Amino acid sequence: MVARLADLDVAGKVVLLRADFNVPLDTDADGATIITDDRRIRSSVPTIKALTDRGARVAILAHLGRPKGEVVARLSLRPVAARLSELLGQPVAVADDVCGPSAAATIASLSDGQVAVLENVRFDPRETSKDPDVRTELASQWAAMGDVFVSDGFGVVHRNQASVTELAALLPHAAGLLVEKEAHVLSLIHI
């Protein structure tokens, strides 16, 4: 049985939240990146609010597209963080890297109830490495910056990736509200 969000003590702790922010993008007339469907972002808001309402410091891990281990500017999570800020009605900090100095400083700067988005996890080739030791190396860097892990990216829970499987093995963890909801719906299906 997977632990539930309500089972975790998160007050004053850094919660590393794996979300599914792989949203469709386009460009507007000025060439700026726009999100054409924000449903995946909106679907994580209840979990984020549940955490911030309980005094957690939320650092979000997510991917966008398939950058294949390289930094691809058009696949940055900055537009996603901006939309999330609008939905939450509060500022959302954005790290300039996946797990380096900017991520560490951004997480360290959070106060209780604040939210940050780390840069696209797939900018780091270790995220999707076939070698579990390589994935664990990346997950260990994240784990050093957090206290607990919450999996709320239902669209990625089946993936064998550093921010999904290896990170959960390193920290106390639970399913987010979206994953709980989807698991419940699946339990109602009789095949």
Role assignments for model-derived ranges:
Residues 1-189:
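Active-site loop-to-helix "anion-binding N-cap" substructures in soluble metabolic enzymes
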